[in-house]
Design a protein with these regions (language model features):
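Metal-ion/cofactor- or nucleotide/acyl-coenzyme-handling active-site neighborhoods
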Residues: 1-249
Length: 249
């Protein structure tokens, strides 16, 4: 994985299909221009995953809407940008919604959410909904939480808070996701595993090693830090109350 940034990006070709002509394969390609430059910001971002810690924990009961005004300071000098994942659109309007499941992308467009909000998705969804879905630049083909984190890095943010980024716990009959049991998600009693997610996040930490990644943790989560992340000097964990203070929520 190579670090890439919005300031060097004009757009890219995506493959819509492959046809055979005269015995040879040819790709049908479309140029997708870059339409969301987003390089003018405070370099602070909040990436919100769908782990249960963001709705079910002891301590401060923080509403997602608080993140939309966090770190404002004088005239919004330190206000961060918010990135959300998949079905979170039903509960909150982040600055940027990232969707990696084509079925969910269809649902989001049909709901009307994409009419007035920025939604990033994969090439398939962009080709199907060109007026409503924006292409994830140089899509790393990762899970949604990791893709949203990558996008925040791509946009040039240098401090990224990760909220609702929970491990799948050791209970084999528990899905640690807010939307477990709903369409396009695993069953409530089906542990999805987290090794791919852990590996994807580690790749991002290593690639964007000039970014300060901060995972917000609740009671009991501190000990659940993946072993692979412990060696990342640009990654740390922060208790919820300390996060509220540091991020000026």
């Amino acid at each position: 994985m190579v670090n890439k940034y919005v300031t060097d990006y004009d757009g890219e070709y995506v493959v819509s299909g492959v046809v055979v002509k005269n015995g040879r394969k040819h790709q049908d390609r479309f140029w997708i221009p870059h339409t969301v430059p987003n390089s003018d910001h405070t370099k602070v971002a909040y990436v919100v995953g769908n782990g249960r810690s963001r709705v079910d924990f002891s301590g401060v009961a923080m509403k997602l809407s608080f993140l939309s005004t966090a770190g404002g300071g004088h005239f919004g000098k330190y206000k961060g940008q918010c990135y959300g994942c998949n079905r979170i659109y039903q509960d909150w309007n982040p600055d940027f919604l990232v969707v990696t499941h084509p079925g969910l992308a269809d649902e989001i467009v049909e709901s009307g959410y994409a009419e007035d909000n920025v939604v990033f998705g994969r090439a398939k969804s962009v080709l199907e909904h060109p007026e409503h879905i924006t292409l994830v630049p140089h899509d790393p083909r990762m899970n949604c939480g990791a893709t949203a984190t990558y996008l925040a890095c791509f946009h040039g943010h240098k401090k990224i808070y990760l909220y609702g980024f929970d491990n799948q716990n050791t209970n084999p009959t528990m899905n640690n996701n807010v939307y477990a049991g709903t369409e396009f998600y695993g069953q409530v009693d089906e542990n999805q595993g987290d090794q791919v997610w852990i590996s994807n996040m580690k790749r991002i930490f290593d690639t964007y090693n000039d970014v300060d990644f901060v995972r917000v943790v609740t009671d009991g989560m501190e000990e659940e830090m993946p072993e692979a992340w412990k060696w990342c000097k640009n990654f740390r964990q922060l208790k919820t109350w300390d996060f509220v203070i540091e991020a000026d929520i």
